[in-house]
């Protein structure tokens, strides 16, 4: 058996890549061009080779190997139990899937709980492990206290995506899965943190469960940092969902900000293509249904 990009295996076949002339590798400059042109950025989580390859073939620009794998794949009650070794394993699996189909997606991997808070040096060691596994960028959660770490990583050639609003690694300190940034004081704090992270060099910023007007204002205030919303309304530069949520195959009730794209699509690839088109065309999220004002 050959190891060509579209070779079959005894256990299934990864989807073929589109013709190469139609596929431009996603990069930070390209994401900046998309934003300048007003084109929304699409992102989904993936934790294995097959789902990553299908997402890439369906046109998703960014794939996130999220520490949400702890809840989705491992059955943990939160993301806190996910280790760096878990993240490296799944990142390598996703990277191999993209390689096999000549994928072009930008690959982001979460730095898990306890892998970057001790020191900037610890963060760099952890980031290097994920980059060596195949990530193009690492994501970390936290406010202004992470800005020195972000700057340290960026100066050493590690692209960084920050994460504000609801930060699942600290959900116990936040008092549960609640909307963040409500009220003037909380909104001002989020804005200050976002600007600090942009100044530190963060190229992307996930905004999770943040009121729509605040997320829109932050997006306008961050020209060098692409905002990716999840439960943050339609005014961000892009959107992200957990793959299993948008396919309707989670074990619980979907969060308010999720739409089940599988319900009408009939196939995994069809559902992902529907998600991409809905985001691109401004039909998802619907601020009246999937967000907080």
Curated annotation (Swiss-Prot):
One of its GO terms (molecular function) is magnesium ion binding. Pfam families: Pantoate_transf. GO terms for cellular component: cytoplasm. Mg(2+) binds at residues 67, 110, 141. Signal peptide: none annotated. Pathway: Cofactor biosynthesis; (R)-pantothenate biosynthesis; (R)-pantoate from 3-methyl-2-oxobutanoate: step 1/2. The keyword Transmembrane helix does not apply. Binds 1 Mg(2+) ion per subunit. Keywords: Cytoplasm, Magnesium, Metal-binding, Pantothenate biosynthesis, Transferase. Its EC number is 2.1.2.11. InterPro entries: Pantoate_hydroxy_MeTrfase, Pyrv/PenolPyrv_kinase-like_dom, Pyrv_kinase-like_dom_sf. Its main location: cytoplasm. 3-methyl-2-oxobutanoate binds at residues 67-68, 110, 139. Its cofactor is Mg(2+). It is found in: Cytoplasm. It comes from the Bacteria. It catalyses: 3-methyl-2-oxobutanoate + (6R)-5,10-methylene-5,6,7,8-tetrahydrofolate + H2O = 2-dehydropantoate + (6S)-5,6,7,8-tetrahydrofolate. Residues 1-25 are annotated as: Disordered. It is an enzyme of class 2 (transferase). SUPFAM superfamilies: Phosphoenolpyruvate/pyruvate domain. Belongs to the PanB family. Catalyzes the reversible reaction in which hydroxymethyl group from 5,10-methylenetetrahydrofolate is transferred onto alpha-ketoisovalerate to form ketopantoate. Homodecamer; pentamer of dimers. This is 3-methyl-2-oxobutanoate hydroxymethyltransferase. It comes from Acidovorax sp. (strain JS42). The gene is panB.
